[in-house]
Amino acid sequence: MIQRRETFLNNVAEKLGRGRRTAGVKRPDYTVKPQFEVMKEHSSDQLVNVLSEQCTKIHTDVKQTKVDRLEQAIDNVLEEYSARNVITWNDPRFDQFGLTSFLQREQVEVWDHTEGERLVEKAEQADIGITFADYTLAESGTVVLLSGNGKGRSVSLLPTYYIAIIPKSTLVPRMSQVTRELHLKAASGERLPSCINFISGPSNSADIEMNLVVGVHGPIRACYIVVEDR
């Protein structure tokens, strides 16, 4: 597409029956922006309630806990899912939220981008993958994951089950807030991740026969653990 951009755009203009417009096109300055009004007055507790209600519709479990009980909350989910082998991101938030000892367990593998192929295989074999959410959309029950060296996509994609740890401060009403923040970061010259994933619960597919099938393109079960920030 990038290589043939001019040809493509010329063809579109021709089909429209006019010449190419290469100047004088301005982005509309909208005076009304309703996308930012939805739930803008909601407190973090209200957003948690919205998230929890939405997650009942997307087959996603939601747990709430405090930092000092986070490791126990994870253990409870592992037991509930009968999951043993774990793979996690290499993310400083695991230490910040008191999970240093959890990462040192024998059955826990921590992502290392220098061992990509081996870790992809480990992710395929893992019972459960655990990451932190960078943003969380209450309206749609979506966690947003920003890729990075220690934050391999395989961790949330390949294991049988998935846990997203959601710091309460990451909750926003909807996608509007996240896209605006990412746009502002890009406009200020900040380099954005090469991959930004929006994950709404376990893998659901019903696009062929209109019958819901879970786990075709990812984990068959997902749990969001909402945790109070330090």
Swiss-Prot record:
Coiled-coil segments: none
GO biological process, one term: lactate metabolic process
Function: Is involved in L-lactate degradation and allows cells to grow with lactate as the sole carbon source.
Entry's family note: Belongs to the LutC/YkgG family.
Name of the protein in its database record: Lactate utilization protein C
Record organism: Halalkalibacterium halodurans (strain ATCC BAA-125 / DSM 18197 / FERM 7344 / JCM 9153 / C-125) (Bacillus halodurans)
